[in-house]
Amino acid sequence: MRTLWIVAVLLVGVEGSMYELGKMILLETGKNAATSYIAYGCNCGVGRRGQPLDATDRCCYVHKCCYKKLTGCNPLTDRYSHSLKNKTIVCGENKPCLKEMCECDKALAICLGKNVNTYNKNYKITMKMFCKKPDAC
């Protein structure tokens, strides 16, 4: 299990907003982002795109579309701040792009939490070759 965690960290990275996103996902779903969503479906994980396989995968698809709208920041390297108020994620950035990035991540975490019952262990590691071309965002 420890080896899997190390590999997941290397694949996902802990720099930039990925660390914050992982914390948000854990809060909303109770699941570890690196071990549960690294290669889930056709859209969860870096560099993955395809027709969503279920509601959980659709959350990741919408998140990628949200990231595509960002200008002036990089989700893999830039960091933002957020806090919790009454168990609610609050994005606390003054820079517009970082605030938008935080809002994208917050929306993903909330979506995954609302759809945690659709999580299908059979989609946990989906090969790209089984994913159909996605619709445009």
Swiss-Prot record:
Alphabetically sorted, this entry's keywords are:
Disulfide bond, Myotoxin, Secreted, Signal, Toxin
Residues marked Cationic membrane-docking site (MDoS) (site): 128, 133
Q: Which SUPFAM superfamilies match?
A: Phospholipase A2, PLA2
- Pfam families, per the entry: Phospholip_A2_1
Cellular localisation: Secreted
Extract one GO cellular component term from the record.
extracellular region
- InterPro entries associated with the record: PLipase_A2, PLipase_A2_Asp_AS, PLipase_A2_dom, PLipase_A2_dom_sf, PLipase_A2_His_AS
Site Important residue of the cationic membrane-docking site (MDoS): list residues: 121, 124
Q: Which residues form the signal peptide?
A: 1-16
Could you give a GO molecular-function term held by this entry? phospholipid binding
Q: Which CDD domains match?
A: PLA2c (cd00125)
Q: Where is this region: Important for membrane-damaging activities in eukaryotes and bacteria?
A: 121-133
Q: Which cysteines are joined by disulfide bonds?
A: 42-131, 44-60, 59-111, 65-137, 66-104, 73-97, 91-102
Chief place of localization: secreted
Q: Which Gene3D superfamilies match?
A: Phospholipase A2 domain (1.20.90.10)
Site entry: Hydrophobic membrane-disruption site (MDiS): 127, 130
- Keyword field contains DNA-binding: no
| PANTHER family reported for this sequence | BASIC PHOSPHOLIPASE A2 PA-11-LIKE, PHOSPHOLIPASE A2 FAMILY MEMBER
Known role? Snake venom phospholipase A2 that lacks enzymatic activity. Is myotoxic, and displays edema-inducing activities. A model of myotoxic mechanism has been proposed: an apo Lys49-PLA2 is activated by the entrance of a hydrophobic molecule (e.g. fatty acid) at the hydrophobic channel of the protein leading to a reorientation of a monomer.
Tell me the protein family, please.
Belongs to the phospholipase A2 family. Group II subfamily. K49 sub-subfamily.
Q: How does it assemble?
A: Homodimer; non-covalently linked.
The protein in question is named Basic phospholipase A2 homolog Bsc-K49
Organism this protein belongs to: Bothriechis schlegelii (Eyelash palm pitviper)
Which lineage is the organism of this entry classified under, starting from the top rank? Eukaryota, Metazoa, Chordata, Craniata, Vertebrata
